[in-house]
From Swiss-Prot:
Keywords: ANK repeat, Repeat
SMART domains reported for this sequence: ANK
UniProt feature, compositional bias: Polar residues: 187-196
InterPro entries found in the cross-reference section: Ank_Repeat/CDKN_Inhibitor, Ankyrin_rpt, Ankyrin_rpt-contain_sf
The protein's name in its UniProt record: Ankyrin repeat domain-containing protein 66
Chain spans, region Disordered: 152-196
């Protein structure tokens, strides 16, 4: 991907997408860019999403060290784990899991990273996620029992998801339309002028 096509992305997004570890580190050290900034022109991807897409394990560790949140999602609810699963980046999934990222989070359509890996035929990722998902759930339960906070919620996504849900026609409306079509055209009921 050319940097010219990413003109609206932050310098950090650009450096991560280009795979320039040294520049990423320099930008983070200087505090020039927010590691959690969502680029609306790229479906709300953060630098961490780009690192997962590109399979850049060291960049992921660096971003998280500087405060990047693995729970942040794109405009359709994809976490960095979804992108890693799609591309078959097993080491990225392992790194995210080791950092206690919620690798079992569903997107807007209910697809988890494991389901994405299944769709794209990433068998090694599927096998790993089948073992890792219960561990992720166990960690979540243990943290809850101990009263430890977990960073698994994207507050912006909660509002955006509700907006998306409201913008889609409801299932009942779709069913009513299907039923009307299957019955054929309806005739107006005019019982007043009709002889019995």
């Amino acid at each position: 991907m050319e940097l010219a096509k990413m003109s609206d992305m932050t310098k950090l997004h650009q450096a991560v997408a280009a795979g320039d570890y040294s520049l990423v580190k320099k930008i983070l050290k200087k505090g020039l860019c927010d590691p959690n900034y969502k680029d609306v022109d790229w479906n709300d991807r953060t630098p961490l999403h780009w690192a997962a897409i590109k399979g850049q394990m060291e960049v992921i560790r660096l971003l998280i060290e500087y405060g990047a949140r693995p729970c942040l999602v794109t405009s359709v609810g994809w976490t960095p784990a979804h992108f890693a699963a799609e591309a078959g980046h097993l080491n990225i999934l392992k790194t995210l899991h080791a950092l206690h990222a919620a690798i079992d989070a569903p997107d807007f359509f209910g697809d988890t990273p494991k389901r994405i890996a299944q769709i794209y035929g990433q068998k090694a990722c599927v096998a790993f996620l089948e073992k890792a998902e219960p561990e992720c759930q166990d960690h979540r339960c243990a943290a809850q029992q101990k009263g430890l906070p977990l960073d698994e919620r994207d507050e912006d996504w909660d509002a955006k998801k509700r907006e998306l849900e409201l913008s889609l026609p409801s299932l009942n409306q779709n069913m009513n339309k299907k039923n009307k079509k299957s019955r054929g055209p309806t005739r107006p009921s005019n019982t007043k002028g009709r002889r019995v």
